[in-house]
């Protein structure tokens, strides 16, 4: 598995344009995903030098196997410095260890702690726990 890193320093990738990234994530996140417009906003955040983060694209034989996006929160003193916003593995490539490899790259690619949100019925929850993520808080939201 090879990895391509995209961030504010590298800028966008000719090989993996934003539209390719948004479409891949939208397709492979399935019921756990967001609209392509919202995914694009997350990419824009990564590419903004005043905000930041990291996009990591995992490939095998030049085909995208998985993508992870982390945003820098800028709030390291009171919440984790990074939030893992999206991770998706190609439906046909699941169960081969690519998710674990991509998560390990994501963890090692950023400084500081990482938070993520995962739905209780998401199969990826077990992987996150194996990698050391814990459920420290119950998140509550007021939808207005």
Which positions does each model-derived feature cover?
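Helix-loop element at the rim of GNAT/NAT acetyltransferase active sites that forms part
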Residues: 18-37
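Active-site rim helix/loop that mediates acceptor-substrate recognition in acyltransferases
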Residues: 33-55
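Conserved beta-strand in the GNAT
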Residues: 55-57, 63-72, 83, 88
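Conserved acetyl-CoA binding element of GNAT-fold acetyltransferases
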Residues: 78-91, 116-119, 138-141
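Conserved beta-strand-loop-alpha-helix junction that forms the acyl-donor binding cleft
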Residues: 115-129, 133-134, 141-144
């Amino acid at each position: 598995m090879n990895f391509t890193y995209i961030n504010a320093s590298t800028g966008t990738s000719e090989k993996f344009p934003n539209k390719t990234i948004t479409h891949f994530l939208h397709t492979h996140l399935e019921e756990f995903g967001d609209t392509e417009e919202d995914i694009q906003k997350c990419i824009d955040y990564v590419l903004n030098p005043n905000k930041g983060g990291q996009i990591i694209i995992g490939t095998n034989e030049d085909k995208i196997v998985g993508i992870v996006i982390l945003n820098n929160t800028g709030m390291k003193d009171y919440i984790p410095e990074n939030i893992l916003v999206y991770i998706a593995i190609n439906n046909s490539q699941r169960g081969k260890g690519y998710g674990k490899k991509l998560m390990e790259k994501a963890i090692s690619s950023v400084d500081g702690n990482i938070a993520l949100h995962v739905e209780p019925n998401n199969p990826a929850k077990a992987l996150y726990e194996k990698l050391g993520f814990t459920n420290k808080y119950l998140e509550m939201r007021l939808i207005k």
